[in-house]
UniProtKB/Swiss-Prot annotation:
Gene coding for it: PSF3
Protein name: DNA replication complex GINS protein PSF3
Lineage: Eukaryota, Fungi, Dikarya, Ascomycota, Saccharomycotina
Keywords assigned: DNA replication, Nucleus
Cell location: Nucleus
Function according to Swiss-Prot or TrEMBL: The GINS complex plays an essential role in the initiation of DNA replication.
CDD domains: GINS_A_psf3, GINS_B_Psf3
GO-annotated biological processes: mitotic DNA replication initiation
Length: 188
């Protein structure tokens, strides 16, 4: 993804739940209380770009000076996006899942989450899901480009609406490449 990739920017704006580990003066406006502090253990939903920074940067705690590594400002809480029920649904049948309704930027967010927490299980689930859904995306892209005179079937249209933005890019690229291959074969 590039520096100005709109999908990456939109994914970074997705709100994730977090819990503050410190009392922070002057940030009450994040809770809707301007001029007041955010209290310790306050739970908020903040954009991913902000939560990521606050989860990495730590502050020195006055409570326990023996701790060598500073506690980060916030602790990221697992979002509903990666809840066990969602992961189980992916494992049981990734092609039947409406990924767009879960999040339009599911793959981007999952990649960032797995990288941030070194989550090997999530990475494996994503890999398996991409392989399974990728085959289905390829089948739909090829069938549309091969039979461009025919109308799309209802199943194909429904499946295409369940794709997230990354999968839509894969679909478009596959479709264009199939059309180019078809042209090349005709010329040969």
């Amino acid at each position: 993804m590039g520096y100005y990739d709109i999908d990456d920017i939109l994914a970074d704006g997705t709100r994730f739940p977090c819990r503050f580990n410190y009392d922070v003066p002057g940030l009450g406006y994040l809770e809707g209380n301007p001029g007041r502090p955010i209290s310790k253990n306050a739970k908020l939903e903040l954009p991913l770009w902000m939560v990521h920074l606050l989860a990495v940067v730590g502050a020195q705690s006055n409570e326990d000076s023996r701790v060598e590594e500073p506690l980060p400002f916030v602790e990221l809480l697992p979002p509903d996006l990666f809840a066990p029920r969602v992961l189980n649904a992916i494992k049981s049948g990734a092609t039947s899942l409406d990924l767009h309704s879960i999040s339009p930027h599911f793959y981007t967010l999952a990649e960032k989450w797995a990288t941030l927490f070194s989550d090997k299980e999530l990475s494996q689930v994503l890999k398996d899901m991409l392989l399974e859904r990728g085959q289905e995306i390829n089948n739909h892209a090829i069938s549309v480009s091969m039979f461009s005179n025919c109308n799309q079937t209802n199943d194909s249209a429904v499946f295409l609406q369940t794709l997230d933005e990354f999968e839509k890019t894969i679909y478009r690229d596959t479709n264009v490449n199939c059309k180019e291959m078809k042209k090349w074969l005709v010329l040969k």
